[in-house]
Amino acid sequence: MRVDAILSNLNLDANIYELESNYQGNILHVMREDALAYSFGGNKVRIAIELFEDLKRKNCDCIISYGGRGSNLNRVIANMAFNQRIPCYVIVSETEGDQFFESINDKMVRLSHAKVINCKKKDVLKTVVQVFEMCNQK
Protein backbone atom coordinates (compact mmCIF):
# COMPACT_ATOMS: atom_id res chain seq x y z
CA MET A 1 0.00 0.00 0.00
CA ARG A 2 1.53 3.31 -1.08
CA VAL A 3 1.40 6.50 0.97
CA ASP A 4 -1.20 7.86 -1.46
CA ALA A 5 -3.42 4.85 -0.78
CA ILE A 6 -3.01 5.28 2.96
CA LEU A 7 -3.91 8.96 2.70
CA SER A 8 -6.92 8.31 0.51
CA ASN A 9 -8.26 5.70 2.92
CA LEU A 10 -7.81 7.86 6.02
CA ASN A 11 -10.16 10.68 6.77
CA LEU A 12 -7.94 12.74 9.03
CA ASP A 13 -10.73 15.22 9.74
CA ALA A 14 -13.35 12.65 10.70
CA ASN A 15 -12.04 12.49 14.24
CA ILE A 16 -13.04 16.01 15.25
CA TYR A 17 -16.08 16.03 17.49
CA GLU A 18 -18.15 18.89 18.87
CA LEU A 19 -18.79 18.50 22.57
CA GLU A 20 -22.39 18.66 23.71
CA SER A 21 -21.60 21.17 26.43
CA ASN A 22 -19.83 24.48 26.05
CA TYR A 23 -17.46 26.48 28.18
CA GLN A 24 -18.38 30.09 28.93
CA GLY A 25 -20.35 30.30 25.69
CA ASN A 26 -17.60 28.72 23.57
CA ILE A 27 -18.30 25.67 21.47
CA LEU A 28 -15.63 23.08 22.17
CA HIS A 29 -14.26 20.49 19.79
CA VAL A 30 -11.95 17.58 20.48
CA MET A 31 -9.74 15.72 18.08
CA ARG A 32 -9.69 11.97 18.71
CA GLU A 33 -6.27 11.00 17.36
CA ASP A 34 -6.73 7.59 18.94
CA ALA A 35 -9.64 6.96 16.57
CA LEU A 36 -7.54 7.17 13.38
CA ALA A 37 -8.06 3.88 11.62
CA TYR A 38 -4.42 2.99 11.03
CA SER A 39 -1.92 1.19 13.24
CA PHE A 40 -4.02 1.84 16.36
CA GLY A 41 -4.20 5.54 15.64
CA GLY A 42 -2.61 8.36 17.54
CA ASN A 43 -0.92 11.58 16.51
CA LYS A 44 2.06 9.50 15.37
CA VAL A 45 0.04 8.42 12.31
CA ARG A 46 -0.01 12.04 11.11
CA ILE A 47 3.72 12.37 11.76
CA ALA A 48 4.48 9.13 9.91
CA ILE A 49 2.40 10.21 6.92
CA GLU A 50 4.47 13.40 6.67
CA LEU A 51 7.72 11.44 6.99
CA PHE A 52 6.71 8.99 4.26
CA GLU A 53 5.56 11.81 1.98
CA ASP A 54 8.99 13.42 2.47
CA LEU A 55 10.67 10.06 1.83
CA LYS A 56 8.71 9.78 -1.43
CA ARG A 57 9.54 13.36 -2.53
CA LYS A 58 13.24 12.70 -1.97
CA ASN A 59 13.17 9.30 -3.73
CA CYS A 60 14.47 7.52 -0.63
CA ASP A 61 14.09 3.76 -0.44
CA CYS A 62 14.67 3.10 3.26
CA ILE A 63 13.52 4.57 6.56
CA ILE A 64 15.21 4.72 9.96
CA SER A 65 13.28 5.27 13.17
CA TYR A 66 14.56 5.75 16.70
CA GLY A 67 12.96 5.41 20.10
CA GLY A 68 12.44 3.25 23.12
CA ARG A 69 10.80 -0.17 23.27
CA GLY A 70 7.40 1.38 23.85
CA SER A 71 7.63 3.97 21.06
CA ASN A 72 4.35 4.66 19.28
CA LEU A 73 6.21 6.33 16.41
CA ASN A 74 8.40 3.27 15.88
CA ARG A 75 5.25 1.13 15.75
CA VAL A 76 3.54 3.30 13.14
CA ILE A 77 6.65 3.78 10.98
CA ALA A 78 7.44 0.05 10.99
CA ASN A 79 3.84 -0.76 10.10
CA MET A 80 3.70 1.82 7.30
CA ALA A 81 7.07 0.68 5.92
CA PHE A 82 5.85 -2.92 5.91
CA ASN A 83 2.68 -1.94 4.04
CA GLN A 84 4.75 -0.09 1.45
CA ARG A 85 7.48 -2.73 1.22
CA ILE A 86 10.14 -0.22 2.27
CA PRO A 87 13.06 -1.48 4.36
CA CYS A 88 12.80 -0.16 7.90
CA TYR A 89 15.46 0.02 10.57
CA VAL A 90 14.36 0.74 14.12
CA ILE A 91 17.06 1.81 16.54
CA VAL A 92 16.04 1.08 20.11
CA SER A 93 17.94 2.65 22.95
CA GLU A 94 17.99 0.37 25.93
CA THR A 95 18.15 1.38 29.53
CA GLU A 96 18.81 -0.89 32.45
CA GLY A 97 16.04 -3.46 32.80
CA ASP A 98 14.81 -3.12 29.20
CA GLN A 99 16.11 -6.55 28.25
CA PHE A 100 13.33 -7.98 30.43
CA PHE A 101 10.63 -5.72 29.02
CA GLU A 102 8.76 -6.17 25.75
CA SER A 103 5.90 -3.81 24.99
CA ILE A 104 3.05 -4.32 22.55
CA ASN A 105 4.64 -1.65 20.33
CA ASP A 106 7.92 -3.58 20.42
CA LYS A 107 6.12 -6.75 19.34
CA MET A 108 4.34 -4.91 16.52
CA VAL A 109 7.62 -3.46 15.25
CA ARG A 110 9.05 -6.97 15.05
CA LEU A 111 5.89 -8.34 13.39
CA SER A 112 6.28 -5.61 10.75
CA HIS A 113 9.65 -7.14 9.82
CA ALA A 114 11.60 -4.02 10.73
CA LYS A 115 15.27 -4.63 11.41
CA VAL A 116 15.63 -3.81 15.10
CA ILE A 117 19.01 -2.56 16.26
CA ASN A 118 19.49 -2.28 20.02
CA CYS A 119 22.02 0.10 21.48
CA LYS A 120 22.85 1.79 24.74
CA LYS A 121 21.51 5.31 25.17
CA LYS A 122 25.05 6.74 25.06
CA ASP A 123 25.62 5.07 21.65
CA VAL A 124 22.51 6.35 19.84
CA LEU A 125 24.29 8.91 17.64
CA LYS A 126 27.01 6.45 16.64
CA THR A 127 24.38 3.78 15.86
CA VAL A 128 22.25 6.15 13.78
CA VAL A 129 25.30 7.15 11.73
CA GLN A 130 26.25 3.49 11.19
CA VAL A 131 22.74 2.53 10.06
CA PHE A 132 22.53 5.59 7.82
CA GLU A 133 25.85 4.69 6.17
CA MET A 134 24.70 1.09 5.76
CA CYS A 135 21.49 2.25 4.04
CA ASN A 136 23.46 4.53 1.72
CA GLN A 137 25.63 1.61 0.59
CA LYS A 138 22.62 -0.41 -0.60
Predicted regions: what they are:
Residues 1-138:
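PLP-dependent amino-acid enzyme catalytic core
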